[in-house]
UniProtKB/Swiss-Prot annotation:
One of its GO terms (molecular function) is metal ion binding. Its EC number is 3.1.-.-. Signal peptide: none annotated. This is Protein pelota homolog. It is found in: Cytoplasm. It comes from Saccharolobus islandicus (strain M.14.25 / Kamchatka #1). The gene is pelA.
């Protein structure tokens, strides 16, 4: 995402959309009553016929729809302003926002949390592709902020089939991996697996892709369980430290350990977390994305809590529905805090 302009007087942010993650962030930030200015098309009656006419409109937002791993955000609302000749003011309309589009978002007042979220997204550039490989199977995935997208999950030919099968299988994996690298243009590749097959794949990848950094690590299996395992590793933090999905999994693991051994250093529930924040006791808070898509009053209360946490140098981790820890956190009221010190 690029922030092209921010007009403080109008509370208007002009943005250029560059990725799926950008669309997901806007889905979280946009609220009912916000106004957006964007290009769109609409069927307009011209005599006995109708044509889809391109135009720029001002839409008062009712709600947004975002489907994971698509390139589109749907913004539903009422047209507040449009070219006079079309006579469509006051009509319901949906803007389809795609990668490459520009949009202006106007709020009555931008919260510090929402602005910081925009700025953080604008600063974010790194992407990584993860390939888990074993002699008989492999999995290729890419993390987005809204979750992990599985690109490929396949079996390989048995080692007993013919001589040289290891090299052939390594080339098969490397070739498919290279195609995804061309498609997504990541900054780095992480190859992991339980045996030495990953080194064979790495050789092939380095021959095909000369200018991509390849990291190698060990993992117990080339499966989704192995993917969950690798997301908790320090190597992931080093390669993509700004991806909250990896950080969130590690923080949740820490919270569960504390609940078992030092439960006084963890609290959960909105009121309990709010009290801990007021005392300056919160080190890290994890919350599910649903809490920022709730009714205006609850959302406003949560945003105030998040602003207070940031002012007191606490860490905020937003957990999307596709995260492996989402349901675990939801069962704990959806919001949990790791504390700096014990409180009553």
């Amino acid at each position: 995402m690029r922030i092209l302009e921010f007009d403080e007087k109008r509370q208007a942010a002009k943005l250029h959309i560059e990725s799926e993650d950008d669309l997901w962030i806007l889905h979280l930030i946009l609220e009912k009553g916000d106004k957006v200015v964007a290009k769109t098309t609409r069927d307009i009656g011209l005599g006995k016929e109708s044509r889809r006419i391109p135009m720029t409109i001002v839409l008062k937002v009712d709600y947004t729809e975002f489907q994971e791993f698509t390139n589109r955000l749907r913004i539903h609302g009422i047209i507040e302003d449009a070219p006079e000749r079309f006579g469509i003011r006051g009509a319901h309309h949906t803007i389809n926002l795609d990668i490459g589009d520009e949009i202006i978002i106007i709020k009555q007042q931008w919260s510090k949390y929402a602005l910081d979220k925009l700025k953080k997204q604008a600063d974010k550039r790194s992407k990584i592709i993860i390939a888990l490989v074993d002699f008989d199977e492999y999995l290729i995935a890419i993390p987005f902020e809204q979750g992990i997208k599985i690109l490929s999950e396949k079996s390989l030919r048995s080692l007993n089939e013919e001589e040289g099968i290891i090299e052939q299988n390594a080339l098969e994996v490397a070739t498919e991996l290279a195609e995804y690298v061309k498609q997504y243009n990541p900054d780095a590749i992480l190859l992991a697996g339980p045996g030495f097959f990953k080194e064979e794949v790495a050789k092939k990848v380095n021959n095909i892709l000369k200018n991509k950094k390849v990291y190698i690590d060990s993992v117990s299996s080339a499966t989704r369980a192995g993917l969950h395992e690798i997301l908790k590793r320090d190597i992931i933090d080093k390669i993509m430290s700004d991806y909250e999905i990896a950080i969130g999994a590690k923080k949740m693991e820490k919270a569960m350990e504390l609940l078992a051994k030092q439960p006084e250093l963890v609290t959960y529930g909105l009121e309990q977390v709010k009290n801990a924040v007021e005392m300056g006791a919160v080190e890290t808070v994890l919350l599910i994305e649903d809490l920022l898509s709730s009714n205006n009053q609850e959302r406003l209360a949560i945003e105030r809590i998040l602003e207070d946490i940031e002012n007191k140098r606490g860490e905020i981790i937003l957990v999307p529905k596709e995260s492996p820890i989402y349901f675990e956190l939801k069962n704990l009221t959806g919001i949990l805090a790791i504390l700096r010190f014990r409180i009553n």
